[in-house]
Amino acid sequence: MEIIHLTDIPSTNDYLLGLHTEQDVVAVSDYQSHGKGMGSNRWESEAGKNLLFSILLHPTWLPVNRQYLLSMAEALALQGTLDAVIPDVTIKWPNDIYWQDKKISGTRIDVNLYGSMLADVVIGTGININQREFHSDAPNPVSLYQITGREYDRNVILHDILSRFEPLLKQLEHGKYADIVSLYHQHLYHRDGMHPYEDDNGTFMAAIDHVEANGMLHLRLSDSTMRRYMFKEVKTK
């Protein structure tokens, strides 16, 4: 993939969505003035300290109702890269990366459709690398530096992520969906045991049963009742 290095830009996702290229491209920036998380969330990042990048894909071969598989593949690449540096890294549904109980990375996906096909998909990711302090009201951010006391080369980490992501992308292109889903489940945060969750009706205890290829989370209650949720419909307490 071609990598475009930028110094300061409002959003790498928006930059790639406006690029109008048929090639797969990665845009990485030292700073994003309007970096976005999921929905209306903002991403706090000190200039030049963290890894902020987006990947533009044209996966016309992937059914629209399975687009979440791209998020799974990206999450697996992130988890593998970071876990090699700081063990105990997991994937928190739907698209965060956690070290223990703290968030070290988040991902946002923007999609353009052409009829019933996925025309353009932009996967934007922020990873806390060398930032020493966080000042926003985000509840639990953490960086590699805070964990290890060391600074890291952001480009080395980016290339490691891409080297893991591209083979996973090939698996999806060849229809090996089940392999990706299985790997994803192996690395889920809170994948074992009962944990507290909260939806519009209040707090409850449940265990993760599985996640569908469309991103739907299935939770199993203590009485074996099943509940299903899409993004933003439930959160971990």
Residue map of PLM features:
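Long, positively charged amphipathic alpha-helical accessory segments at protein N-termini or as interdomain linkers
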Residues: 62-63, 72-88, 99-237
